[in-house]
Regions:
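PRPP-associated nucleotide enzymes
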Residues: 1-271
Length: 271
């Protein structure tokens, strides 16, 4: 008889209470929030910026794997099997026969998607893991305000049938780019995804409104909600309770307090 201690491994996500719906998860993690605060600070520069992005996404992807990915029971001989027939581990692991696609939305999503891809290759069967690439551009008006998004090009390796499709994109500002990319996968890429999940460092109420309206089936994981331009009566209330009054975007569609344009700072675009 084997020990059944790990036959059903519990995992409970630590998340902030809110009123945005069951598919939105605002991860409550003091360590990651500390790292994110450093990442967004004015004096933080390269190479620390990209190092922090790597660390944050490594932990965020692990959180999503723990919370969302299916598991299976395994019986695996350990190195002690040569000494005793009891040298066998039996318990749950992440199902290695899971198909997963991570989507790089360039530029800001390039490093997060690579981190996600590398970690997935060590978690499930690498032959079932794929990374796709989308070139996305913001459309701006004469006042430099964002008015939309357009796809400039894409490298999509195949279908997404029964796959977990992950979109690691640091800043959920307007939701325009992600919504457009997700719509592309829903309408142009063959197959029906098993689950679509976005992984964001920071999101705004406006982003959540758009995503939950246009893609109510999509699951959202974020480390922080920024609503810094909301009226005073919003502060101190539970996120989403006064959703219509919450505001996290300035007139140029940048997040406040935010951390600036991540596509720029991650690539030293100002040099």
């Amino acid at each position: 008889m084997r020990d059944t201690l790990y036959a059903n491994v519990p995992f409970q996500l630590n998340e902030m209470a809110h009123h945005y719906g069951a598919n939105v998860h605002l991860v409550g993690n003091p360590f990651l929030l500390s790292q994110l605060a450093t990442l967004c600070a004015k004096g933080t520069l390269q190479p620390q910026i990209n190092r922090l992005v790597e660390q944050l996404y490594t932990d965020l992807v692990k959180t999503v794997i723990n919370a969302e990915f299916p598991r299976k029971m395994v019986t695996l001989p350990t190195r002690m099997i040569d000494s005793t027939p009891l040298g066998i581990y039996q318990g749950e692991v992440v199902d290695p026969q899971l198909r997963v696609v991570t989507v790089n939305i360039a530029r800001a999503g390039t490093l997060p998607s690579q981190v996600t891809y590398d970690l997935l290759n060590f978690t499930v069967d690498p032959s079932l893991v794929r990374q796709d690439h989308i070139i996305m551009s913001r459309m701006i008006d004469a006042a430099q305000a964002v008015v939309g998004s357009e796809i400039g090009g894409a490298k999509i390796g195949g279908d997404v049938d029964d796959a977990f499709v992950l979109f690691p994109d640091p800043m959920g500002a307007t939701g325009g780019s992600l919504s457009t990319a997700i719509q592309l996968y829903k309408t142009k890429v063959p197959g029906r995804a098993r689950r679509i999940i976005t992984l964001n460092l920071i999101v705004t109420p406006e982003y959540l409104r758009r995503m939950t309206t246009e893609h109510p089936d999509v699951i959202i994981y974020a480390l922080r909600l920024d609503r810094g331009l909301s009226p005073p009566e919003v502060f101190g209330t539970a996120p989403g309770l006064l959703w219509d009054k919450e505001r996290g975007l300035d007139d140029r569609q940048y997040i406040v307090p935010g951390g600036g344009g991540f596509g720029e700072i991650m690539n030293n675009a100002y040099v």
